[in-house]
Amino acid sequence: MNPIRRIALVALAFAMADAPSWAGPSNAPPPPTTRTDPNGLLLNQWFSEGTAAGHAGDDYDNRDGGHSRLDLAKYPQLRPLPYLDSQRVGKKDYGPPREIRTETVFGNASLSGSALGGASIPRMMASTREGLGFLAGQYLANQLYVFPEHQDHDPAGEGLSGYGDLYAVNPPYLVISQGSSGSDQPFLDAIAMTMASFNPEVKEMLRKEKLLMPVVQQILRTSLKPLKQREDYLTALAHPTAFPADWLDEERMMRAAQSLTPLTLPPMLQLEVMREPAPPRPGIDFFEGPAKESESLSDRGIVVARIVRGMGWERELTVRVTRTREWAGRPLQIHWRLLRGDPDLVTIERSATAPEATIRVKWHSGPIEAPGGIPGLSGHRVEIGVFADNGTDFSPPCFISFYFLPNERRTYDETGRILETDYAFPGSFADVTLTAQKPWRDRYRYDKDSGAPLGWTRSENGKAPVDFDADGRELLPEGPRRLTYEEDLVSRRLRFIPAE
């Protein structure tokens, strides 16, 4: 397998020939697949009987210059997503998607940056509010993409070359394949076969409702080979950040899609943050450049996400279930499940009067086990799954996540007060998509009598210590001075300078 190279530098490979066109009679559409394996024969049988929709109205989008292109000769009804020549010249068909199309689209791009100096496409896009919002818009517009994790989801430790699960968010808006170039191919085949297997009436209904891809996601996850019983869907086993290809059960996915009727579609739900304490203050409670001055990545929709930046020991969110849908009007039960995180440090308190829960997450000091995925994997994300249940089927997943920056080593006292934060300890990893490198250590001071915060002292190798007051001002003989923080975009180091 060829390694994936950096996005925006060079494509890994170019120019596979376009798929040949079907040469059948104009009034007789080709079958949905030329595959002759049992799944291919089954799909063509359904199509000939009129119970499978095939790929009419579906487009495929390859965004890596043909490096890992789906073989469209296997799917003669599937149309390559059209681009104008001017769009191709402008590379609008290359790299991360940049627009929400009106067509029904699934696609891929086997492109990535390295784990340390860059990121995979999903990690890059899910690390900003704008990126997550764009992915949500795609997902709810009948568009689904597959991207390899490359170096962003591999076990770390002695004798291992990986860095753990580096994703701040587990984005259900797309599919992440475990591996590098070509690892996306089995997923493209499975998605193509699933999309063609829907009953025509059901598929058109989902297309109009803009809910086709959430149902495809639900089918993929409920059909995974490791799931042995219904309740397994409510565990991390069904929701790894990146999926191994050998977990796919293509036939099961096809049969699940084929069996759906307008009244047996899986339920739907979304989330919204209802209450939250005042956010931490940049330059006082945490330190980042202008583009990273918020803890919030998403407050509503399919994902609620926070980057834990402020020095507080605990985070609290009250999240409400909204926009539920049950196609046959059946009652819904809502499940709130801790998928990742120390259960002694996470509480989920459900309301007795409203469809909401208050979630409290205390500081997690070390790597967080990532159960359910590949063995030996850990990360830095606490994750809660929220699912609607109609008694027969579960909804596609919604996630609430809290990400703890791996380049921070914090010490708290027994009451939860911050005592010290070391940003430059040996082996620390600064995720350039989320934080800057900070070559210092902060030790916090408190009034001995009242316990009120007095400020902190910043130590950096080769420099004199710098004292700050509780408002983040540098203490100088002539008086306190306000500072501003800037990130050097080349070195990714944070510096503090006098505010103008």
How would you name each of these model-derived features?
Residues 22-187:
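Long, solvent-exposed N-terminal ectodomains/accessory regions
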Residues 200-292:
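Catalytic cores of secreted or luminal carbohydrate-active enzymes
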Residues 271, 279-284, 293-309, 329, ...:
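Low-complexity "stalk/linker" and mucin-like segments enriched in Ser/Thr/Pro/Ala/Gly
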Residues 320-328:
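Acidic, Ser/Thr
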Residues 334-336:
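Short beta-strand elements bearing conserved aromatic residues within extracellular beta-rich modules
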Residues 389-394:
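Short, solvent-exposed loop/turn segments at the edges of extracellular beta-sandwich modules
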Residues 395-500:
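Extended alpha-helical scaffolding regions
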